[in-house]
Amino acid sequence: MLVLSACAAPQPKPVAPPEPARAPLDASYDWRVLLVAPFGSVLKDVPLTLHEVLLFRDEAGHAAPADELECYAVDGARPRFVARSPSEYLLCFKHDRLSRVEATVQLPAEEAVRIYADACGLWLKKPVGFGEECAGTDGGITFAGHFENEPDESAQLTIQLDAAEPADSAPER
């Protein structure tokens, strides 16, 4: 006698399709695009036309106090950063050598949190959530990014790059 038996199993639940892969970030999300000259470069060797700006700040914890730095803004085109032209782009020198770069970009409020998280995740080489610290060191350069909401409902992302080695001890070029 031949016996057939079968198992009854519930219908498999439909599996949601995976989320489509996100497009790679624009190359301008990498903070290295802001380095138009190596840290330690002499002011006259920077390949841009610059004008001096006066900074008035009350900040603590930076590599060099603001009063020790001479900062310059660029006359003309600025390097694109997070797919935008920076509203502020400063090259700061200590003892006539490049020691800090700072850039600020305006972000649309509805995309600001995502852009900040994407950029910071790229810089730190790991996913980050909004509000997490976005600072580190890479290749002898310290970086710190921060995000601010503006009263007009826009947002801005600022990054500061500092030479890990003091500019006044950089090798002669």
Regions found by a protein language model. Give the residues of each.
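A charged, solvent-exposed segment within the mature domains of Sec-exported extracytoplasmic proteins
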Residues: 110-173
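Short helix/turn-capping signatures at newly exposed starts of structured segments
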Residues: 7-122, 163-173
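Sec-dependent bacterial lipoprotein signal peptides
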Residues: 1-5
